[in-house]
């Protein structure tokens, strides 16, 4: 490629794009770690995007009506960091660029939400960014339908690489976006035909443009190193009536004389000798991290070009009726609905009196029917299991093309994209998402669920059919290890409520959470209401509490969750009949119990006596409460699952696997 000709054709563009490239090269070299090739290859596309098309104001990084820019190919993070520094984001200082990938750096190896203003989402696991962006596009459509396009009218731009498009989640996401006709979503494909193993063709033959077209997208193409051609394609993309893929044909490591267009430039520093040659090829005579003042000033002018449009938008917001303005600001700030606690208390009082025997998945549906009128931002999602998960209430319409006021989306069989899109909705602002599937299929959503926890996105995962209690569908659908996986994930609340009252309390906590996602593990089988005396206080908020005290001298403590609390209470009755004083502790959320002070934990789990945990799942997370917290190994036992389940009616399964009142009582007596 003739670099001199390109430089002569668009000299102003060339110097702006070269500033991105050299910052990326220098930062990776200084860190002795990183991915210079992608920023070098996509610098031209990014320059045209930020210079001519992206609606943003670097001095107001949280402006509600800004365009969102998602770097799905997160390994090329220095592309984003260079742009943020050059355009004048306050936190993106040159010192931060020099501190790339170091301890305490805002500029982490892959972009991390919350570390640096201008980073819209955490990316790095390939495919997550493009899928999260679909959720942002959905949230934009939802907010525009509620508040009007004078207040909400922006695009979601994504840079995705070959790896993003190979990941299975990308097909889930693009199929969903195509079905929903998300014309506010534009994906810029860094089509450089390189992976770590070499050419993309060594592992893939997919016609990506045909794939997107078949999924309901418009597809455009451009020369990713021709500024005028890039501008033409992006201008056309903004006018489309469907989501758009722009195929940007690029060279990875553009300008490197010996490493461009090869895997060698993907994930390693260029080295001093190659950097010298590359600078010469660019015509760049400045040293490491040096950006001439006139180029920095031009970039900062690009960063400020949205200020006037933002001021006009703020004037429109200020002109709204006070109530509507306050509601818009509250929703974008992700505030908790002020009437939520009252609605939950009223629901609990009514249900403790009625004492229904219902599955906790049904209890969840009942809670949602009670709180939906006061939590208007709830946007719910289902992976093709509406009738099983029970997350759609009668007052909710479907979100679809032509009805973006709808708050219920049918995802199809796309668990992973559902989870990622929910992350995007919350990150965009204005939507409090929850979505559901069978608990066993959290396996399909794990990557995005982990990012919820890492980013502090308080998504609610409604996971039903939580144990062998689902019965005849068998071990492919019966979760036994999934509670352990969720509990092992940092910054995750895993709720397994025992009845309708605990279900309501779990929902209150999940919808009030600011930075922690929640998993609600809910039963298929009916469970009795255990707490028939109304308690205004949210007992689940403590994570564990005494649901039945020992009569006489306490000799044993039974700990249980969910459907096994009822079984533990029946075991208590058997033991008390033999004068074995037994306390039953319901532990709907281990994480919240662990967060309580030692005095409270000691009151619930005092020293001495036998401890037996009961759960239709594997033992692993229980050892802290059985052996630690003043417990003793010789007096600790577990009644639950040691392997996978089987296909049979639920009652038979509980009997065959020994999760019965009689087995629990026998375990206690064997340890006395």
Curated annotation (Swiss-Prot):
Which terms are listed as keywords in the entry?
Calcium, Magnesium, Metal-binding, Thiamine pyrophosphate, Transferase
Q: Which InterPro entries match?
A: THDP-binding, Transketo_C/PFOR_II, Transketolase-like_C_2, Transketolase-like_Pyr-bd, Transketolase_bac-like, Transketolase_BS, Transketolase_CS, Transketolase_fam
What cystine linkages occur within this chain?
A: none
Q: Where are the transmembrane segments?
A: none
> Any idea which GO molecular function terms this record carries?
metal ion binding; transketolase activity
| Pathway given in the UniProt record | Carbohydrate biosynthesis; Calvin cycle; Carbohydrate degradation; pentose phosphate pathway
**May I have one GO cellular component term?**
cytosol
What are the EC numbers?
A: 2.2.1.1
For activity, the cofactor(s) needed are:
Mg(2+); Ca(2+); Mn(2+); Co(2+)
Its annotated function is as follows:
Catalyzes the transfer of a two-carbon ketol group from a ketose donor to an aldose acceptor, via a covalent intermediate with the cofactor thiamine pyrophosphate.
Quaternary data: Homodimer.
Could you identify this protein by its name? Transketolase
To which species is this protein native?
Rhodobacter capsulatus
């Amino acid at each position: 490629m003739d670099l001199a000709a390109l430089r002569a054709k668009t000299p102003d563009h060339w110097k702006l794009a070269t500033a991105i490239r050299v910052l990326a090269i220098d930062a990776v070299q200084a860190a002795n770690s990183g991915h210079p090739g992608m920023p070098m290859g996509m610098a031209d596309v990014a320059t045209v995007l930020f210079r001519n098309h992206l609606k943003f104001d670097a001095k107001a990084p949280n402006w509600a009506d800004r365009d969102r820019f998602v770097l799905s190919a997160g390994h090329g993070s220095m592309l984003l960091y260079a742009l943020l520094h050059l355009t004048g984001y306050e936190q993106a200082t040159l010192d931060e660029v020099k501190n790339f990938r170091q301890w305490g750096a805002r500029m982490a190896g892959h972009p991390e939400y919350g570390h640096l203003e201008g980073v819209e989402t955490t990316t790095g696991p390939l495919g997550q960014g493009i899928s999260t962006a679909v959720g942002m596009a959905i949230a934009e459509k939802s907010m525009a339908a509620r508040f009007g396009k004078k207040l909400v009218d922006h695009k979601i731009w994504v840079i995705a690489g070959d790896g993003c498009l190979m990941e299975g989640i990308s097909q889930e996401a693009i199929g969903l976006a195509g079905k929903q006709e998300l014309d506010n979503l534009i994906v810029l494909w860094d089509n450089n035909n390189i992976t770590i193993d070499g050419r993309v063709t060594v592992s893939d033959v997919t016609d990506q443009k045909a794939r997107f077209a078949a999924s309901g997208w418009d597809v455009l193409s451009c020369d990713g190193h021709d500024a005028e051609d890039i501008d033409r394609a992006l201008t056309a993309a903004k006018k489309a009536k469907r989501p758009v893929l722009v195929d940007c044909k690029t060279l990875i490591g553009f300008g490197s004389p010996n490493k461009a267009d090869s895997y060698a430039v993907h994930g390693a520093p260029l080295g001093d000798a190659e950097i010298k040659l590359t600078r010469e090829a660019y015509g760049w005579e400045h040293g490491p991290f040096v950006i001439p003042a006139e180029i920095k000033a031009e970039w900062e002018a690009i960063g400020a070009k949205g200020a006037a449009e933002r001021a006009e938008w703020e004037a429109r917001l200020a002109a709204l009726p006070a109530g509507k303005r306050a509601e818009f600001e509250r929703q974008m700030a992700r505030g908790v609905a002020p009437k939520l606690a009252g609605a939950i208390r009223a629901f609990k009082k009514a249900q403790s009196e009625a004492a229904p025997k219902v599955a906790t998945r049904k209890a969840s549906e009942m809670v949602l029917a009670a709180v939906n009128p006061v939590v208007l931002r709830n946007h719910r999602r289902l992976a093709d299991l509406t009738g099983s998960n029970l997350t759609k209430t009668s007052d909710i319409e479907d979100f679809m093309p032509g009805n973006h006021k709808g708050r219920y989306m049918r995802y199809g069989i796309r668990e992973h994209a559902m989870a990622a899109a929910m992350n995007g909705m919350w990150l965009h602002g204005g939507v409090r998402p929850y979505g559901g599937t069978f608990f066993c299929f959290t396996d399909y959503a794990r990557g995005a669920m982990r990012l919820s926890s890492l980013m502090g996105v308080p998504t609610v995962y409604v996971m039903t059919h939580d144990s062998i209690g689902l019965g005849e569908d068998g071990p492919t659908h019966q979760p036994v290890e999934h509670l352990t996986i969720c509990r092992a994930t940092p910054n995750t609340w895993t709720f397994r409520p025992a009845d309708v009252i605990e279900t309501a309390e779990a929902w209150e906590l999940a919808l009030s959470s600011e930075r922690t996602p929640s998993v609600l593990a809910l039963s298929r089988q009916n469970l009795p209401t255990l707490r028939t005396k109304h308690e205004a206080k949210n007992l689940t908020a403590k994570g564990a509490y005494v649901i039945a005290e020992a009569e006489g001298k306490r000799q044993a403590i039974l700990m249980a969750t969910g459907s096994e609390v009822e079984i533990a209470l029946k075991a208590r009755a058997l033991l008390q009949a033999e004068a074995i004083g037994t306390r039953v502790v319901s532990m709907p959320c281990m994480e919240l119990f662990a967060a309580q002070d030692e005095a409270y934990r000691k009151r619930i789990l005092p020293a001495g006596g036998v401890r037996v945990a009961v759960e239709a799942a594997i033992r692993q997370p229980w050892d802290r409460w059985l052996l630690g917290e003043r417990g003793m190994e010789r007096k600790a036992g577990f009644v639950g699952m040691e392997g996978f389940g089987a296909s049979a009616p639920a009652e038979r399964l509980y009997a065959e696997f020994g999760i019965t009142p009689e087995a629990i009582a026998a375990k206690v007596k064997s340890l006395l």
